[in-house]
C-alpha cells in the first residue's frame, strides 16, 4: 500500500525511491510484523485467558504435557494479523503472487479457526470433523491450483524444478494442478502435525520462509535465474515481502511460544502457515525443494502414516507415540532437547536445500 504513496512522493523528493526496492521493503516488512507481534502479543494472551480459550491436552499423551492444559491457544491469529498488516503496508498490492498467498493464509486460517473454536469454545474435543476439514482444505487448494494454471503467462510458471539436475525441468501441463493441490494441502497438514511442542513448528517455518525469500528474490531476477538454471518468474520478487513478514511474525510469536509456552498457535496458525509455505513453493516452482527444506515436517507426517499403517496391518506400533516428537519424549528426552535438536535438523536441511541451487 505504502509503495504507491512513496511512488507519488518521489516526484517531490527522490529519497522516497528507496521504497521501490524489494529488499528495503522486505526488511521493513520483517520489522513491522515482528514489532506488531511483540506489542500485541501480551494483550492477546490476556484476552485469551479472560475468555478461557485454553489448550485441551490429550489424556493419553506424555505426562509432562498435563501442565500445559489451559494454556491459551489460537495464537495463530497473532501471527496472521502480523503478516497481513505487514504485507498490506509494504507489499505491491498489484501483484497476484501477493494475493495468492494472502488468500491461502486467510482460507486455511479460517478452517483452522473453526476447528479451534469448536474445540476450545464449544468444548467439542473432536473439533471440526476430519472429513469436512479435508473437504474445505481441498476446495481452497483446488481454487488456487486452477487459478495459477489458468493465469500462467510464462513457460517457467508450470515447469518442475528438480534439485541437483539443471537440465531437467519438465513441463507439468495439467498435472501442475494435481501437484499444486497436494503440495498445499500436504504442507498444511504436515506443519499441523509438527505443532505439538513449544516452538517446534514455528522455528522450522521461519527457516523455510527465510530460504524461500532468497529463492523468490533470485527467481524474480533474470540474471540470477539464468545463472542458477531456475525458472525466471517476473514479479516473483514481491514474494520476498510475504516471506519476510512470515519470518518476522513467526519470531514475534516465538517470543511467547518458546518453552514453557505462554500461548499456542492452534490450528488457525499451523494450517495457515503450512499452506502458505506450500503455496510459495508452488509459486516459485520448488515443490521438491520444500520436501527437502521442510524435512522435519515430512518426518513428522511419515511417522504418523507408518504408525497408523503398522497398527492397522500388524496390530503393532513402530513408535511409542506419533508424531515422532512424542516418541522421543516418552524415551525420556526433555521437551527442550527434542525441540532444539529438531531445530538443528531443520537448519541443516534448509542449508542443504539452498545448496542445491548451485549443486546442479
UniProtKB/Swiss-Prot annotation:
Places the protein is found:
Cell inner membrane
Residues annotated as coiled-coil are: none
What Gene Ontology molecular function terms does this protein carry?
metal ion binding; phospho-N-acetylmuramoyl-pentapeptide-transferase activity; UDP-N-acetylmuramoyl-L-alanyl-D-glutamyl-meso-2,6-diaminopimelyl-D-alanyl-D-alanine:undecaprenyl-phosphate transferase activity
| Biological or metabolic pathway of the protein | Cell wall biogenesis; peptidoglycan biosynthesis
Q: Which domain of life is it from?
A: Bacteria
Keyword Cytoplasm found:
no
Q: What does this protein do?
A: Catalyzes the initial step of the lipid cycle reactions in the biosynthesis of the cell wall peptidoglycan: transfers peptidoglycan precursor phospho-MurNAc-pentapeptide from UDP-MurNAc-pentapeptide onto the lipid carrier undecaprenyl phosphate, yielding undecaprenyl-pyrophosphoryl-MurNAc-pentapeptide, known as lipid I.
HAMAP family recorded: MraY
The similarity comment for this entry is: Belongs to the glycosyltransferase 4 family. MraY subfamily.
Protein name (record): Phospho-N-acetylmuramoyl-pentapeptide-transferase
Amino acid at each position: 500500500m505504502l509503495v504507491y504513496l512513496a511512488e507519488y512522493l518521489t516526484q517531490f523528493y527522490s529519497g522516497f525511491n528507496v521504497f521501490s526496492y524489494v529488499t528495503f521493503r522486505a526488511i521493513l516488512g520483517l520489522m513491522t510484523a515482528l514489532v506488531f507481534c511483540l506489542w500485541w502479543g501480551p494483550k492477546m494472551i490476556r484476552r485469551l485467558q479472560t475468555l478461557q480459550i485454553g489448550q485441551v491436552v490429550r489424556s493419553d499423551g506424555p505426562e509432562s504435557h498435563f501442565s500445559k492444559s489451559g494454556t491459551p491457544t489460537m495464537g495463530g491469529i497473532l501471527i496472521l494479523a502480523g503478516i497481513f498488516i505487514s504485507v498490506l503496508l509494504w507489499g505491491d498490492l498489484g501483484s497476484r503472487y501477493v494475493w495468492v498467498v494472502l488468500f491461502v493464509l486467510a482460507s486455511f486460517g479460517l478452517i483452522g479457526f473453526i476447528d479451534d473454536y469448536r474445540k476450545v469454545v464449544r468444548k467439542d474435543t473432536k473439533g471440526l470433523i476430519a472429513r469436512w476439514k479435508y473437504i474445505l482444505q481441498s476446495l481452497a487448494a483446488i481454487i488456487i491450483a486452477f487459478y495459477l494454471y489458468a493465469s500462467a503467462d510464462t513457460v517457467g510458471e508450470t515447469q518442475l524444478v528438480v534439485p541437483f539436475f539443471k537440465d531437467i525441468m519438465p513441463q507439468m501441463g495439467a498435472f501442475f494442478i494435481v501437484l499444486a493441490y497436494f503440495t498445499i494441502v500436504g504442507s498444511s497438514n504436515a506443519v499441523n502435525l509438527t505443532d505439538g511442542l513449544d516452538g517446534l513448528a514455528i522455528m522450522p517455518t521461519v527457516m523455510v520462509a527465510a530460504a524461500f525469500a532468497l529463492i523468490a528474490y533470485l527467481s524474480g531476477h533474470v540474471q540470477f535465474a539464468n545463472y542458477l538454471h531456475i525458472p525466471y518468474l517476473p514479479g516473483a520478487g514481491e514474494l520476498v515481502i510475504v516471506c519476510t513478514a512470515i519470518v518476522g511474525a513467526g519470531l514475534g510469536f516465538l517470543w511467547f511460544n518458546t518453552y514453557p509456552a505462554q500461548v499456542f498457535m492452534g490450528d488457525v496458525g499451523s494450517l495457515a502457515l503450512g499452506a502458505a509455505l506450500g503455496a510459495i513453493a508452488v509459486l516459485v516452482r520448488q515443490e521438491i525443494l520444500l520436501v527437502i527444506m521442510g524435512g522435519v515436517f515430512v518426518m513428522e507426517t511419515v511417522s504418523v502414516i507408518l504408525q497408523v499403517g503398522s497398527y492397522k496391518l500388524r496390530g503393532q506400533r513402530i513408535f511409542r507415540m506419533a508424531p515422532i516428537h512424542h516418541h522421543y519424549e516418552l524415551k525420556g528426552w526433555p521437551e527442550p532437547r527434542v525441540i532444539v535438536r529438531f531445530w538443528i535438523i531443520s537448519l541443516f536441511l534448509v542449508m542443504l536445500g539452498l545448496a542445491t541451487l548451485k549443486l546442479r
